[in-house]
Design a protein with these regions (language model features):
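Charged, low-complexity intrinsically disordered regions
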Residues: 1-73
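ASCE P-loop NTPase motor core, strongest for the SF2 helicase catalytic module
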Residues: 60-226
Length: 226
């Protein structure tokens, strides 16, 4: 009922009313911004939890364990120091360092990231820095338009020679390559190749999946999106 209206008094049944405190009304107003239009309840996406500040600590304290765990990861990520990997063969500009730290911070609490800098500002090297830092999380999959697959290979060789880069499009034994890929490996594939090998790719537990020109999957009716 609070979902539908948050006046000072809310009728719970018949002639019985309960007074809603100002702090609770403020909380509900904030939460309704993230509402998924579910009947009689408010849904909060994980990514929205980062914007709920300390004034709502009491609400988190009485919530379920999953919500508390997510909030704890977010809190820790805000104070964590994310250093540039020493294995990165290149120098990041200040704004690229900010982008790298933002990606690491968001990934540390299981959020996904969308890096939308203008062309030429170094999205690739920022992403490669993240790959180097997260290499111990598992093999890495990069999906890109066919026209830039080889560019990814050259950039990885240039900036991250310690990573083992493999091009799925060039391999004659694709199933074997996917099966054998492991920690420290980066598999680069075109969107078309991803679709033909999706059954094999889905079997693998990837540490990171990078989608270059991710607008390629914006249409939810396409096979690439699914």
């Amino acid at each position: 009922r609070l979902h539908n209206g948050i006046g000072k008094y809310v009728r719970i049944d018949g002639d019985n009313y309960v007074e809603v405190s100002q702090s609770l009304r403020q909380l509900i107003s904030r939460l309704r911004l993230y509402n998924d239009d579910l009947e009689n309840r408010i849904a909060i996406p994980e990514l929205a939890l980062a914007s709920l500040d300390n004034e709502f600590d009491d609400a988190f304290a009485s919530s379920n364990g999953d919500l508390l765990a997510i909030r704890d990861r977010i809190t820790k990520s805000q104070i964590a120091e994310f250093v540039i990997p020493s294995t990165l063969n290149g120098e990041l500009k200040n704004y690229q360092i900010d982008g790298y730290k933002w990606m690491m911070r968001t990934l540390s609490w299981s959020g996904g990231v969308c890096l939308a800098d203008d062309m030429g500002l170094g999205k690739t090297i920022q992403t490669i820095a993240v790959m180097l830092q997260k290499r111990d999380d598992g093999p890495i999959l990069v999906v890109a338009p066919t026209s830039v697959v080889l560019n990814w290979q050259s950039e990885l060789v240039r900036f991250a020679p310690s990573l083992n880069t493999k091009i799925l499009n060039q391999c004659a034994h694709k199933t074997k390559m996917i099966d054998e890929i492991s920690f420290g490996d980066v598999l680069v594939a075109s969107y078309g190749m991803m679709l033909t090998q999706i059954a094999n790719l889905e079997k693998k537990e990837w540490g990171i999946i990078v989608l270059d020109e991710a607008h390629a999957i914006k249409n939810y009716n396409t096979k690439a999106f699914k």
